[in-house]
A protein has these predicted regions:
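Hydrophobic small-molecule pocket/channel-lining residues, especially in calycin-type beta-barrels
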Residues: 1-155
């Protein structure tokens, strides 16, 4: 049996490994809670991220969404590819741009935003990472739609 070492470039995603929790804000002023668990999978060849986000509907009701992402590196091109599985049964594919402590990718446009394009930015910080969702409504430039500071609570 032959084993292949994981691509060294995956190390750039290492800041996403661990347990993270944060409270975020939406552009319209509402808040939400997010939990993320990131871990290496399949002998370190892939990163999995299990996520849940809870949005308060009223004083007694929360709208909770779950998703899981698997991130790997395409052998031929060296590009970072993510497959995201949602609790709505969707499978989304994203190509990631990975720079020093920063990950950017095109994301789904929030349905109530009436935007044309959305992108997500994950930025490494001393406490974990920040996640920003930006939208472009009319081609005039991106604006922040949501922001959450995710603090590492466990390795």
């Amino acid at each position: 049996m032959s084993h292949v070492a994981p691509p060294p470039s995956l190390g750039a995603l290492g800041f996403l490994v661990g347990r993270f929790r944060g409270e975020g804000t939406l552009q319209r002023g509402a808040t939400f809670e997010k939990d993320v668990v990131g871990r290496w999978e399949v002998a370190g060849h892939f990163l999995s991220l299990s996520m849940s986000a809870s949005y308060r509907v009223n004083d007694r009701v929360m709208d909770v969404h779950h998703a899981m992402a698997l991130v790997g590196v395409e052998r031929g091109s060296g590009a970072f590819q993510a497959h995201v599985f949602t609790d709505g049964g969707e499978i989304l594919e994203h190509r990631l741009i990975v720079e020093d402590g920063r990950i950017t990718f095109g994301d789904r446009v929030p349905h109530e935003s009436r935007a044309r394009v959305a992108r997500k930015i994950l930025l490494r910080t001393p406490y974990g990472y920040d996640e920003t969702l930006e939208i472009d409504r009319d081609g005039g430039g991106f604006e922040t739609y949501s922001f959450v500071r995710l603090e590492r609570i466990a390795e």
